[in-house]
């Protein structure tokens, strides 16, 4: 401490845990500063940084601890450890998360005065705020509003009567999916004494609008955004609300977390302490995967395997929420036999007919110049293309007044500004021509 002589307490602690037969705990102790080590092999030497190497390493004698500390009885490992290697690895990560977060918090409390952590409202209080917000929809006017109200009511009832498990919410565009999923999540959390709601979104292009909706309903102080577009510095001289959110972002100690698929799954499969601190706080949470059809196909198996672990072993509930539900049940059947998905939306096929607002017409091949001329002739139009270069070329040939180009090359703040301008022009009935790549297809609201 304070510049004194360093000792390899990580390796020493791991060796003690290994002697007690606690290999997952040994991994966690060995990596609580440098990150979870690779297991390695029995041929590894003491010079290797693997787990096998660390267990062979000679460290300074430390037997004196036995005269000063008595280890508590170590409980047997959970039954899940008999399942398979993946389950064992996942359990090790959760154990590691508990250790590194506790280590950070203990050090923080020792080195400084207590910090403002865990100050959000309870699930009960948030559910009351949601009910107050949705009370204005209790007497819906018009067929579509009645259907939205029916979907919201069905999700609320399912949460009030449901248990932890795997769910799907298949709601067509315009059906009120965001608020309905929140109603289910909070109702389920209250009924089953769960800790938080985590909303996982594939793209940063829609994360702002979701966080804004939740903040309006629940209060900004209860909603944590955590993704690459948000910078948290955790400096004590920051504005108090920003400082509290910076602290909460370290371990997701917040009632509602809005994050990206990248942040969520890379944390589950990462090995650094800063990534893994939050993992134990995913346990006993309701996790909503918005736009679930956009789970990356090359990584679909590890994503589904992680979701199954959270539901089966860590008291979580998962909701796959989308307007175009992917066929994931067969993959769950393969990776987690017996884990069945329950649909929350009443009569999904019927809802699609009611909310249908588009007509498909096959135009065949169009020259880009012809397409550009047709777009320029429209007062309000949206054109989605599959290449950024094409989007820019089409945009360059449109009248500059009221024309917009949306691609992933835009900074998030600039994209947010343009979307707000688009919404205002549509609201005011002004000319508005939007050329976009597929980023707008993932649920971006423009009206």
Listing of model-derived features with the role each one plays in the protein:
Residues 323-377:
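Interdomain hinge/linker at the junction between the two RecA-like core domains of SF2 helicases
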Residues 219-269:
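Inter-Walker segment of RecA-like/P-loop motor cores
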Residues 302, 308-309, 357-389, 393:
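Conserved interdomain hinge at the start of the Helicase C-terminal
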Residues 162-185:
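Walker A/P-loop
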């Amino acid at each position: 401490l304070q510049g004194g002589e360093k000792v390899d307490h990580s390796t020493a602690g791991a060796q003690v845990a290994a002697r007690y037969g606690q290999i997952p705990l040994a991994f966690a102790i060995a990596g609580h500063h440098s990150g979870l080590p690779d297991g390695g092999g029995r041929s590894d030497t003491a010079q290797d940084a693997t787990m096998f190497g660390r267990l062979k390493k000679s460290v300074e004698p430390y037997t004196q601890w036995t005269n000063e500390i008595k280890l508590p009885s170590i409980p047997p490992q959970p039954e899940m450890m008999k399942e398979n290697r993946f389950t064992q690895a996942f359990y090790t990560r959760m154990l590691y998360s508990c250790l590194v977060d506790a280590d950070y918090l203990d050090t923080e409390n020792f080195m400084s005065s207590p910090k403002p952590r865990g100050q959000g409202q309870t699930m009960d209080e948030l559910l009351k705020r949601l009910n107050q917000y949705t009370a204005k929809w209790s007497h819906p006017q018009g067929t579509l509003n009645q259907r939205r109200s029916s979907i919201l009511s069905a999700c609320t009832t399912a949460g009030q009567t449901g248990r932890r498990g795997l769910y799907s919410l298949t709601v067509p565009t315009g059906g009120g999916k965001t608020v309905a999923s929140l109603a289910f999540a909070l109702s389920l959390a209250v009924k089953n004494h769960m800790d938080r709601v985590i909303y996982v979104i594939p793209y940063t292009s829609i994360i702002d609008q979701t966080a804004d909706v939740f903040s309006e309903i629940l209060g900004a102080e209860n909603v944590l955004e955590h993704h690459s577009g948000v910078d948290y510095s955790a400096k004590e001289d920051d504005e108090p609300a920003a400082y509290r959110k910076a602290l909460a972002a370290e371990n997701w100690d917040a009632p509602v977390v809005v994050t990206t698929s990248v942040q969520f799954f890379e944390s589950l499969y990462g090995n650094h302490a800063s990534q893994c601190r939050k993992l134990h706080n995913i346990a006993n949470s309701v996790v909503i995967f918005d736009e679930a059809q956009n789970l990356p196909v090359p990584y679909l198996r590890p994503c589904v395997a992680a979701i199954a672990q959270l539901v089966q072993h860590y008291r979580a509930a998962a909701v796959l929420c989308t307007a175009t539900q992917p066929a994931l049940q067969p993959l769950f059947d393969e990776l987690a036999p017996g884990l069945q998905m329950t649909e929350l939306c009443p009569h999904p096929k019927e809802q699609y007919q009611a909310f249908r607002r588009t007509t498909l017409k096959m135009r065949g091949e169009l020259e880009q110049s012809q397409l550009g001329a047709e777009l320029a002739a429209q007062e309000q139009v949206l054109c989605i293309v599959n290449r950024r270069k094409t989007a820019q070329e089409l945009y360059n040939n449109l009248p500059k007044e009221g024309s917009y180009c949306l691609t992933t090359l835009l900074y998030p703040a600039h994209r947010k500004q343009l979307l707000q301008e688009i919404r205002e022009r549509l609201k005011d009935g002004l000319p508005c021509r939007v050329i976009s790549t597929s980023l707008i297809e993932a649920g971006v609201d423009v009206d």
